[in-house]
UniProtKB/Swiss-Prot annotation:
PROSITE patterns: GRAM_POS_ANCHORING. Residues 602-714, 715-824, 825-935 form the CNA-B domain. This is Serine-aspartate repeat-containing protein E. Residues 61-75, 92-108, 130-145, 216-241 have a biased composition (Basic and acidic residues). Residues 159-207 have a biased composition (Polar residues). The gene is sdrE. The lineage of its organism: Bacteria, Bacillati, Bacillota, Bacilli, Bacillales. It is a peptidoglycan-anchor.
Length: 1141
């Protein structure tokens, strides 16, 4: 029995294994013209299972018994009548004018969707009406303009057509009726019936075979072998091949078989739980319908096809799971709840994984069987069909659909399109099938009545349990439902502020007003038709119909149901608009009434893999030969899918379920460390080796002679010696020792490291178990050594350098050597000296400077050593390699860098920072010199303001002769208090009273390299009473260098009696403020002698005798000088005071 999964999936191509059917519905819509009395119900046909698809047609008929002129007047009025609808509440879509007028001639036919108008008798004239499909969006105005021509126009034919697909006609016609509006109970139509055009708008088979298979159901019943052949052919059909749309060859409608189809290849292995990370997606695509426009016409049966191909890692084990995710806006089936996914099977029918579907997450979870433990390198191919979820997407919109295999996503932008209401005059209606219950044998239909909310009069809605022909005649036996008093019919009223979803599918009716009870007396049943009388309405209504159906004897679902709305216009004409929905299915089964022949015989291939020790390609010629286990063997089917298995402990393998006459390929994976043996080493096909790849055709029997042999690939060594080349000649001498613990690295031809080792105590190293090929050997230079010269002599005695290439060709290679010699070390340094004569040259009398810090930096600027000069000024850095260095001298405190680079490098000064390069020698030429320099800094700034106010009247005659010679070099800090009393007797008598108040404030700030700071504050209070007649001649020569800080208070009283009488009264007030800032730098530093020591110009020291009597003349001059200084000070202070006042 073929895997049916309780789902029907037979097509004219025969039994399809591993298919799941999904139901969808298409529509036929009929818009009917206004007629007078005796209206015929017109229902078009449409089919669809897991999705809805309808065709629309309109009929416009009127018979006028008035005169021709009257008819013309009516026609004229109608032609010029333009109506505008404004509906801001309903998102029901576009209007499309689709009128047609039947031929008046009998037996005439047409093959197009446009019917020709023909004249009728002179007393009868048809009035063309405008049949419309109306699109009304919220707050959008639409104007329907009536045309004088009558044209039948299809609403979008579905875009995918199968060779098995049949078409259903949909026509509308104009009939002549009496002028008085009446209902006719006679469904028959006496007018001649033209042959309708065929419309490609119905359910198609999603299987899309490569070629049409024209075979009848009866033929399948009588010839079961033919059925099996069709199944096998379908399994081998390439999933990606899609047929070109062709003209249908049958008028029997066909149900859409939405399928999931798989093709697989090989096995795997790991722990349980989700193993999405072990699934590799090789291809993913999303296609809408025929893939031309990415428009998902949800009511026209356009499906979304998701194709995915993936491989399953060999680590996957039984019980592990992987996931497939649908987009949240789609569902696997549009009409039923049959969402169980198909099992994944290989071409022989063995199950690889079983799936379960989670409706909440829209995810399939596949659980792997033990198939993945038996086989390897499994490849799978999967095609999933789904449909727009009308609950998730209630209105037209654009979506980005995303599907995923094992978490790897792919996306596609699509536009969702829903059907239009069928409109003629005030009649506007649309319907779809919404749910199929095969267990209860019921079908649910939802009908929108007046979705455009027009003002409709004399409104009646018919629900017919059958298809109708092109003229409204009921056609029994071509699909039906049961419409009677047991049919569930519910009516709901739509409030003005409510919007109907464009999907034409209501999931929650509680939001609408249930007015079913209002139709208890307005509902009638007759001839499998229910009629509801709505009367005059301006609201929209929803009718939900749940009717019964009877399956056919072979289990097919021949279901059809139609509905129409009729109203009268202001002239009393009926306007018709209608839809019909239907489902027709094919049953996918292998049974029937005939006798099924026994299952087709299947065959197997396989045999043996062995180790061919003697490499002769023949089994059993050496006693050491043995079977090889765990060798991977892969079978490729004719369709390109594969499966793999490994040899068992006895070296055997086997593939079963193979079909006669088909060709397969067997490939053996060469085990690591082995090589394939000789092919066809004997004429005995049972004992030879067939090689790594074998192509075999099944010829009515098993083939267990497909063997292959391998032999171990020989291994080789590589290495030799690392030695100390003491004479640096690059040749291994007998007395030169090996170097131990040298690291050696081996790389393959791709640069990958395949081994590391170190030399032993004798300097030897070796790499083993190597195959033929090219290798690279790298030696790491030992610490304290330098590589010697390379390639100087014979290959086995020279040095190959730090990196060398070794080739193994069917033999060991022990010639890769490397030599090193000990790296010499060097020293650097010299001398730091006191360059007393500042000439930058080391003189024999100049001494070294001790404790000078010297820093050594390497080429990177890193400090590698510091030291200080010894007591002789010497310094040194040892154990240095050849290279670049920098020496930095730190200048001693108080000393100055001497001039640099004045003479030979070993006798001059190199400066504070010196760059030096050592190349295989010491360098003791890095010197530096410093000297001590006198430095004087003096900056003097003096600001003096003296104000002296003096009024003096003096009459004095004085004669004094004084000669004073003084040379003084003095740096002193003294505090002197002097009291002098002088008595002089002369011819002059002077009486003088002088009162002087002097206040002198001097502030001096001096910065000097002579370390001298002077702050002088002098306050002098002098009261002098002098009576003198004096004649003084004084010659004073004084050379004084003095820096002093003194505070002097002098009180002098002098009494002199002379012949002159002078009365003097002097009052002096002096205020002196002096601010001095001195900074001087003479570039020289002179030691400062003790402040108490003074020298004269001639360097003759002098001191005042304790008696104070030595050099009286000088003393007198000093006294008078002091008095005059005091007087001058008083005068200055008094002037300043006067100025201040």
């Amino acid at each position: 029995m073929i895997n049916r999964d309780n789902k029907k999936a037979i097509t004219k191509k025969g039994m399809i294994s591993n298919r799941l059917n999904k139901f969808s519905i298409r529509k036929y819509t009929v818009g009917t013209a206004s007629i007078l009395v005796g209206t015929t119900l017109i229902f078009g046909l449409g089919n669809q299972e897991a999705k809805a698809a309808e065709n629309t047609s309109t009929e416009n008929a009127k018979q006028d018994d008035a005169t021709t002129s009257d008819n013309k007047e009516v026609v004229s009025e109608t032609e010029n009548n333009s109506t505008t609808e404004n509906d801001s509440t309903n998102p029901i879509k576009k209007e499309t004018n689709t009128d047609s007028q039947p031929e008046a001639k009998e037996e005439s036919t047409t093959s197009s969707t446009q019917q020709q108008q023909n004249n009728v008798t002179a007393t009868t004239e048809t009035k063309p009406q405008n049949i419309e499909k109306e699109n009304v969006k919220p707050s959008t105005d639409k104007t329907a303009t009536e045309d004088t021509s009558v044209i039948l126009e299809e609403k979008k034919a579905p875009n995918y057509t199968n060779n098995d697909v049949t078409t259903k006609p949909s026509t509308s016609e104009i009939q002549t009726k009496p002028t008085t509006p009446q209902e006719s109970t006679n469904i028959e139509n006496s007018q001649p019936q033209p042959t309708p055009s065929k419309v490609d708008n119905q359910v198609t088979d999603a299987t899309n075979p490569k070629e049409p298979v024209n075979v009848s159901k009866e033929e399948l019943k009588n010839n079961p072998e033919k059925l099996k052949e069709l199944v096998r052919n379908d399994n081998n059909t390439d999933r990606s091949t899609k047929p070109v749309a062709t003209a249908p060859t049958s008028v029997a409608p066909k149900r859409l078989n939405a399928k999931m189809r798989f093709a697989v290849a090989q096995p795997a292995a790991v722990a349980s739980n989700n193993v999405n990370d072990l699934i590799t997606v090789t291809k993913q695509t999303i296609k809408v319908g025929d893939g031309k426009d990415n428009v998902a016409a949800a009511h026209d049966g356009k499906d979304i096809e998701y194709d995915t191909e993936f491989t399953i890692d060999n680590k996957v084990k039984k019980g592990d799971t992987m996931t497939i995710n649908y987009d949240k806006n789609v569902i696997p089936s549009d009409l039923t709840d049959k969402n169980d996914p198909i099992d994944i099977t290989d071409p022989s029918g063995e199950v690889i994984a079983k799936g379960t579907f989670d409706k909440a997450t829209k995810q399939i979870t596949y659980t792997f069987t033990d198939y993945v433990d038996k086989y390897e390198d499994i490849k799978a191919r999967l095609t999933l069909y789904s449909y727009i979820d009308k609950q998730a997407v209630p209105n037209e919109t654009s979506l980005n659909l995303t599907f995923a295999t094992a978490g790897k996503e792919t996306s596609q932008n699509v536009s969702v399109d829903y059907q239009d209401p069928m409109v003629h005059g005030d009649s506007n209606i649309q319907s779809i099938f919404t749910k199929l219950d095969e267990n209860k044998q019921t079908i649910e239909q939802q009908i929108y009545v007046n979705p455009l909310k027009k003002t409709a009069t004399n409104t009646k809605v018919d629900i017919a349990g059958s298809q109708v022909d092109d003229y409204g005649n009921i056609k029994l036996g071509n699909g039906s439902t049961i419409i009677d008093q047991n049919t569930e019919i519910k009516v709901y009223k739509v409030n003005p502020n409510q919007q109907l979803p464009q999907s034409n599918r209501i999931y929650d009716f509680s939001q609408y007003e249930d007015v079913t009870s209002q139709f208890d007396n307005k509902k009638s049943f007759s001839n499998n038709v229910a009629t509801l009388d709505f009367g005059d309405i301006n609201s929209a209504y929803i009718i939900k119909v749940v009717s019964k159906y009877t399956p056919t004897s072979d289990g097919e679902l021949d279901i059809a149901q139609g509905t129409s709305m009729r109203t009268t216009d202001k002239y009393g004409y009926y306007n018709y608009a209608g839809y019909s929905n239907f489902i027709v299915t094919s049953n996918d089964t292998g049974g029937g009434d005939g006798t099924v022949k026994p299952e087709e015989k299947l065959y197997k291939i396989g045999d043996y893999v062995w180790e061919d020790v003697d490499k002769d390609g023949v089994q059993g010629t050496d006693s050491k030969e043995k079977p090889m286990a765990n060798v991977l063997v892969t079978l490729t089917y004719p369709d390109g899918t594969t499966k793999s298995v490994r040899t068992d402990a006895n070296g055997h393998y086997e593939f079963g379920g193979l079909k006669d006459g088909e060709t397969y390929t067997v490939k053996f994976e060469t085990p690591a460390g082995y090589l394939p043996t000789k092919v066809n080493g004997t004429t005995d096909g049972e004992k030879d080796s067939n090689g790594s790849s074998i192509t075999v055709k099944i010829n009515g029997k098993d083939d267990m002679s497909l063997d292959t042999g391998f032999y171990k690939e020989p291994k080789y060594n590589l290495g030799d010696y690392v030695w100390e080349d003491t004479n640096k000649d690059g040749i291994q001498d007998a007395n030169e020792p090996g170097i131990k613990d040298v690291k050696v690295t081996l790389k393959d031809s791709t640069g990958k490291v395949i081994g590391t080792t170190t030399t032993d105590a004798s300097g030897k190293y070796k790499f083993t178990d190597l195959d033929n090929g090219n290798y690279t050997v790298e030696f790491e230079t030992p610490a304290g050594y330098t590589p010697t010269v390379k390639n100087t002599t014979a290959e086995d005695k020279d040095s190959n350098g730090l990196t060398t290439t070794g080739v193994i060709k069917d033999a060991d290679n022990m010639t890769l050597d490397s030599g090193f010699y000990k790296t010499p070390k060097y020293s650097l340094g010299d001398y730091v000296w006191y360059d007393s004569n500042k000439d930058g040259k080391q003189d024999s009398t100049e001494k070294g400077i001790k404790d000078v810090k010297v820093t050594l930096l390497n080429e990177k600027g890193e400090v590698i050593g510091t030291t200080k000069t010894d007591e002789n000024g010497k310094y040194r850095f040892d154990n240095l390699d050849s290279g670049k260095y920098k020496v930095i001298f730190e200048k001693p405190a108080g000393l100055t860098q001497t001039v640099t680079n004045t003479t030979e490098d070993d006798k001059d000064a190199d400066g504070g920072e010196v760059d030096v390069t050592i190349t295989d020698h010491d360098d003791f030429t890095l010197d530096n010199g410093y000297f001590e320099e006198d430095t004087s800094d003096s900056d003097s700034d003096s600001d003096s303001d003296s104000d002296s106010d003096s009024d003096s009247d003096s009459d004095s005659d004085s004669d004094s002769d004084s000669d004073s010679d003084s040379d003084s070099d003095s740096d002193s800090d003294s505090d002197s208090d002097s009291d002098s009393d002088s008595d002089s007797d002369s011819d002059s008598d002077s009486d003088s009273d002088s009162d002087s108040d002097s206040d002198s404030d001097s502030d001096s700030d001096s910065d000097s390299d002579s370390d001298s700071d002077s702050d002088s504050d002098s306050d002098s209070d002098s009261d002098s009473d002098s009576d003198s007649d004096s004649d003084s001649d004084s010659d004073s020569d004084s050379d004084s260098d003095s820096d002093s800080d003194s505070d002097s208070d002098s009180d002098s009283d002098s009494d002199s009696d002379s012949d002159s009488d002078s009365d003097s009264d002097s009052d002096s007030d002096s205020d002196s403020d002096s601010d001095s800032d001195s900074d001087s730098d003479a570039g020289k530093h002179t030691p400062v002698k003790p402040m108490s020591t003074t020298k004269d110009h001639h360097n003759k020291a002098k001191a005042l005798p304790e008696t104070g009597s030595e050099n009286n003349g000088s003393n007198n001059a000093t006294l008078f000088g002091g008095l005059f200084a005091a007087l001058g000070s008083l005068l200055l202070f008094g002037r300043r005071k006067k100025q201040n006042k």
